[in-house]
Swiss-Prot record:
Heme b binds at S44, H93, K96. The modification Phosphoserine is found at S44. This is Leghemoglobin 49. O2 binds at H61.
Length: 146
C-alpha cells in the first residue's frame, strides 16, 4: 500500500505544530546528542558550544530536516518515491561522516520531537506516517551517498 492522503495530512498538520515552537528544534538536537554525543561535531552550529544552544542556524537546520521529511510525505503520496531536490545532500552527508546508525538516531529524535509537538494528537498512525516519510528521505539520501 502506498503513502495515503491521510498520512500526508497527518505529517502536514504536525509539521505545522513543530514550526510554531522553536524549542522543538532544541529538543531535536538534544535527543540526537543524548544518543550520539560524537555527532556534535557534524553540526557547525553545535560543535563549538557547550551543549545545544538555540540559534538561528540551529532553527534553520531543524526546519530544513523536518521540512524535507514533510516534502518526502508529499512526494510519496503523489509519486510513491522520494527524489532529492538538493543534489548535494549525498556529498554533504559523506563529508560529515554520516553512516547508517546516524540515520537511526535522527529518526528516533525526529519521532520523539514530533510526538512532543503533536501533544494529544499523537497516535500510532501519526508515528507511522512520519516513519515512512523519513525512511523515504533516508533512502534517497543514502542512494545519493553511494
Amino acid at each position: 500500500m502506498g503513502f495515503t492522503q491521510q498520512q500526508e495530512a497527518l505529517v502536514n498538520s504536525s509539521w505545522e505544530s513543530f514550526k510554531q515552537n522553536p524549542s522543538y528544534s532544541v529538543l531535536f538536537y538534544t535527543i540526537i546528542l543524548e544518543k550520539a554525543p560524537a555527532a556534535k561535531g557534524m553540526f557547525s552550529f553545535l560543535k563549538d558550544s557547550a551543549g545545544v544552544v538555540d540559534s538561528p542556524k540551529l532553527q534553520a537546520h531543524a526546519e530544513q530536516v523536518f521540512g524535507m521529511v514533510r516534502d518526502s510525505a508529499i512526494q510519496l503520496q503523489a509519486t510513491g518515491e522520494v527524489v532529492l531536490k538538493n543534489g548535494s545532500l549525498g556529498a554533504i552527508h559523506i563529508q560529515k561522516g554520516v553512516v547508517d546508525p546516524h540515520f537511526v538516531v535522527v529518526k528516533e529524535a525526529l519521532l520523539k520531537t514530533i510526538k512532543e509537538a503533536s501533544g494529544d494528537k499523537w497516535s500510532e498512525e501519526l508515528s507511522i506516517a512520519w516513519e515512512v516519510a523519513y525512511d523515504g528521505l533516508a533512502t534517497a539520501i543514502k542512494k545519493a551517498m553511494s
